[in-house]
Amino acid sequence: MKHPIITLTSDFGVQSQGIGIMEGVALEINPEAHVIHLMHGLPDFNLFYAARTMETVSYMPVGYHVCVVDPGVGTKRKPIIIETGRGDFLIGPDNGVLIPATRFLGGIKKVVEITNEKYMKKPISPIFHGRDIFTPAAAYLSKGVKIGEFGKELKPEELAKAPYEEAITEEDKIHAKIISINKFGSLHLNITHSAWDKCGAELN
């Protein structure tokens, strides 16, 4: 891809200089990349909202998608890369926030823990992994570095669980959760199109 797509999502708030810093880090590594700021106004540390937002990268071109909603930053939680069946790479903390998106991107193909400091920005801050670990990983991947170069492979079942599961279908019923409510009052549920179709209902 001549101009690979890197998306950035965080709970930093639009006033944060961290947003521009992450874009700068990405472009320093790969000046040919095109950076899309998907969302930076997520509620602080809210994994539900963040996971729901990451689902929408399915509307983006195949690319490298970073999520920095990370209440466990500074702890032993793992930084990870998930390669999906569609060909996207999801980069962020192992706190479940990336898992729901994989259901819309062809499932999980491969997972690695990011441990190779060759592909990190130094000095590595214990509290700004978005700048020093996640964004550099996305940028190096977009330049063609193979996922296996970043660290050891993990099994999908080793990963932290998603903040919510898929809705449960039962004949003509769906048991769902409200994931978020936008400012217009629209509800976002954990219902996929295929689950909705099974119930024979119309979806707007």
Where are these regions (language model features)?
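Short, solvent-exposed amphipathic alpha-helices that sit
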Residues: 18-26, 182
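Short, intrinsically disordered, charge-balanced linker/junction segments flanking boundaries
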Residues: 58-61, 199-204
